[in-house]
Amino acid sequence: MARDYKIEDYRNFGIMAHIDAGKTTTTERILYYTGKSHKIGEVHDGAATMDWMEQEQERGITITSAATTCFWNGKRLNIIDTPGHVDFTIEVERSLRVLDGAVCCLDANAGVEPQTETVWRQADRYKVPRMVFINKMDKLGADFFNCVKMIEDRLGATPLCVQLPIGSETEFEGVIDLIKMKELVWKGEGLGAEWEERDIRADLADKAAEYREALVETAVEQDEAAMEAYLEGEEPSEELLKSLIRKGCIALAFNPILCGTAFKNKGVQPLLDAVVDFLPNPTEVPAIKGIDFKTEEEVVRRASDDEPTSLLAFKIMNDPFVGSLTFARMYSGHLETGISLLNTVKDKKERIGRMLLMHSNSREDIKECFAGDIVAIAGLKDTTTGDTLCDPMKPVILERMEFPDPVIELAIEPKSKADQEKLGVALQRLAAEDPSFRMKTDEESGQTIIAGMGELHLDILVDRMKREFKVEANVGAPQVAYRESLSQKGLVDYTHKKQSGGSGQFARVKIEFGPGEPGSGFVFESKIVGGNVPKEYIPGVEKGLKSVMDGGLIAGFPVIDVHAMLVDGAYHDVDSSVLAFEIAARAAFREAKSHCAPKLLEPIMKVEVVTPDEYTGGVIGDLNSRRGQIAGQEMRGNATVVNAMVPLANMFGYVNNLRSATQGRAQFTMLFDHYEAVPKAVEQEVIAKSA
């Protein structure tokens, strides 16, 4: 069967932003205007179509990125709605990995907020072309031009205004389209509100002409012929100008800026036009690269139905009716139900039984899909996030995704012994869905420990266990996920000998330990020359060292950023084995404790507090008392923004303190920034607690 839409008519894009910038409302309006939603859902009354989990509807925030397909002007739009809360950055990361373009929503009053910077950096990493929708232009304090300046200053981006607002706050009427040089004015604020094109009013004509000139000057830089014609006094046509803006947006040269108010139904249709006009189709972004499963050489998969089939699983979700759903992006080829694909990461075959097109939480069965599609596949057994599914005859592993380590953990146990097994199943299912959620069993206490990206993250997971899996659990107080590392270099020479009749065990290792680069994890190298330690025993040394990393040296926390170099050793023809060298390496690492001054590291959070001016002194004093380092403060509108670096250990319960100290008028956001050595007094306290 042929495809309904040419691949050139696809737009795979996401909507990303800081929490409360109006992403979900914008998506709701898009779904309404593209004819997919019969009634509009409001986030305020918990009925938004994209927010389909109970917790999302209660809390008014988006937790899981729901994928949906809709149509506009003969183009097929696959939209992924992403969460803006910092605890769910992993969802944003996963979405960006499989998208071709993005719309970044800003709150016209707040402008660029901390989470905006985070998602923008993530999009930079994946080289995603994006445009900006300055939303909430009707809000008190809305300032379009300040937002544009913040995009430049804070994001280091090149904003290109393709619209200007007509009025702001309660006076916001519509926009000036700088490409057509016309006003678009909405009549009323009702659903499906009509708008009309008008000539630009006299008092805005100069401003419009100034921004139009800047727009054209930037756009013609994308094409020499267009630039020459412009320099000779020839204005580009509307079509040429659109194609130049498209070219620059896709090349990441600049970001088109639009504005409106999704809640009041103004500016959404022109935003949809801009998605079609400026964001790339799957053939206009670089082809995805991968590694040939057999030869380990780099291979490229172009976005074409004629290429071998390859998909990337980017999200696992438990659906109450269908069971486990795997969301996947079809990068190349064509797929029908009933076919078996190879999961190259797990080296297992998966049969494609049922494929669905998702519209938020309703679904439509499909029999086949093509390059560029985003589909949900039901019933895959072994596939997890980041796995590649492909044609077994042309196996490939597509680029993996990187997932951050959790920074907060807590103990959890079922309220009744009967729920023990259900708890295990629930946690495994949740961990399969969310790679930033980890679980382990504490060997000493036997407790189950869960770890995640923040208090809200773990709150919601515990809540989901109760609702979806009917498991009631007791939860301990949140604990900081400390790490350990080494402060200095040290040389350890260790010999492992064991003789108990027959062949014994013998291995000698001489290892130089030292601190590694931040973020390097564990780096092992061998400088053995001349067979003092035979080649086949060296992997045993590495394995032994790695086994100590998880258990820690001083307080039982995982060891990070260590460089270990095997410089010498000795073996015995009969008594040496891989196991003997593994045991020797393990003991050598433990002995490094007395040579390399191990240290405890704690997660340091980047905190931003936005507070009314009169509370600034109190907010700064409170952050200082939490061992915080104030990084700076600035005015934003009539509020003060305080930036600080604060240890996570001192931030538990901060939200309630801030609320009572500022009568609920201040807000804060917190992001993990880096690990740092703990002060000695605190270190001793933590070690004593963990003993």
UniProtKB/Swiss-Prot annotation:
<dbReference type="InterPro" id="IPR014721">
    <property type="entry name" value="Ribsml_uS5_D2-typ_fold_subgr"/>
</dbReference>
<dbReference type="InterPro" id="IPR041095">
    <property type="entry name" value="EFG_II"/>
</dbReference>
<dbReference type="InterPro" id="IPR009000">
    <property type="entry name" value="Transl_B-barrel_sf"/>
</dbReference>
<dbReference type="InterPro" id="IPR047872">
    <property type="entry name" value="EFG_IV"/>
</dbReference>
<keyword id="KW-0342">GTP-binding</keyword>
<dbReference type="InterPro" id="IPR005517">
    <property type="entry name" value="Transl_elong_EFG/EF2_IV"/>
</dbReference>
<dbReference type="Pfam" id="PF14492">
    <property type="entry name" value="EFG_III"/>
</dbReference>
<dbReference type="GO" id="GO:0032790">
    <property type="term" value="P:ribosome disassembly"/>
</dbReference>
<protein>
    <recommendedName>
        <fullName>Elongation factor G</fullName>
    </recommendedName>
</protein>
<feature type="binding site">
    <location>
        <begin position="135"/>
        <end position="138"/>
    </location>
    <ligand>
        <name>GTP</name>
    </ligand>
</feature>
<dbReference type="InterPro" id="IPR035649">
    <property type="entry name" value="EFG_V"/>
</dbReference>
<dbReference type="InterPro" id="IPR000795">
    <property type="entry name" value="T_Tr_GTP-bd_dom"/>
</dbReference>
<dbReference type="InterPro" id="IPR035647">
    <property type="entry name" value="EFG_III/V"/>
</dbReference>
<dbReference type="Pfam" id="PF00009">
    <property type="entry name" value="GTP_EFTU"/>
</dbReference>
<comment type="function">
    <text>Catalyzes the GTP-dependent ribosomal translocation step during translation elongation. During this step, the ribosome changes from the pre-translocational (PRE) to the post-translocational (POST) state as the newly formed A-site-bound peptidyl-tRNA and P-site-bound deacylated tRNA move to the P and E sites, respectively. Catalyzes the coordinated movement of the two tRNA molecules, the mRNA and conformational changes in the ribosome.</text>
</comment>
<dbReference type="GO" id="GO:0005737">
    <property type="term" value="C:cytoplasm"/>
</dbReference>
<keyword id="KW-0251">Elongation factor</keyword>
<keyword id="KW-0547">Nucleotide-binding</keyword>
<feature type="binding site">
    <location>
        <begin position="17"/>
        <end position="24"/>
    </location>
    <ligand>
        <name>GTP</name>
    </ligand>
</feature>
<keyword id="KW-0648">Protein biosynthesis</keyword>
<dbReference type="InterPro" id="IPR053905">
    <property type="entry name" value="EF-G-like_DII"/>
</dbReference>
<dbReference type="GO" id="GO:0003924">
    <property type="term" value="F:GTPase activity"/>
</dbReference>
<dbReference type="InterPro" id="IPR004540">
    <property type="entry name" value="Transl_elong_EFG/EF2"/>
</dbReference>
<dbReference type="GO" id="GO:0005525">
    <property type="term" value="F:GTP binding"/>
</dbReference>
<feature type="domain" description="tr-type G">
    <location>
        <begin position="8"/>
        <end position="283"/>
    </location>
</feature>
<dbReference type="InterPro" id="IPR031157">
    <property type="entry name" value="G_TR_CS"/>
</dbReference>
<comment type="similarity">
    <text>Belongs to the TRAFAC class translation factor GTPase superfamily. Classic translation factor GTPase family. EF-G/EF-2 subfamily.</text>
</comment>
<dbReference type="InterPro" id="IPR020568">
    <property type="entry name" value="Ribosomal_Su5_D2-typ_SF"/>
</dbReference>
<dbReference type="InterPro" id="IPR009022">
    <property type="entry name" value="EFG_III"/>
</dbReference>
<feature type="binding site">
    <location>
        <begin position="81"/>
        <end position="85"/>
    </location>
    <ligand>
        <name>GTP</name>
    </ligand>
</feature>
<dbReference type="Pfam" id="PF22042">
    <property type="entry name" value="EF-G_D2"/>
</dbReference>
<dbReference type="Pfam" id="PF00679">
    <property type="entry name" value="EFG_C"/>
</dbReference>
<dbReference type="InterPro" id="IPR005225">
    <property type="entry name" value="Small_GTP-bd"/>
</dbReference>
<dbReference type="InterPro" id="IPR027417">
    <property type="entry name" value="P-loop_NTPase"/>
</dbReference>
<keyword id="KW-0963">Cytoplasm</keyword>
<dbReference type="GO" id="GO:0003746">
    <property type="term" value="F:translation elongation factor activity"/>
</dbReference>
<dbReference type="InterPro" id="IPR000640">
    <property type="entry name" value="EFG_V-like"/>
</dbReference>
<dbReference type="Pfam" id="PF03764">
    <property type="entry name" value="EFG_IV"/>
</dbReference>
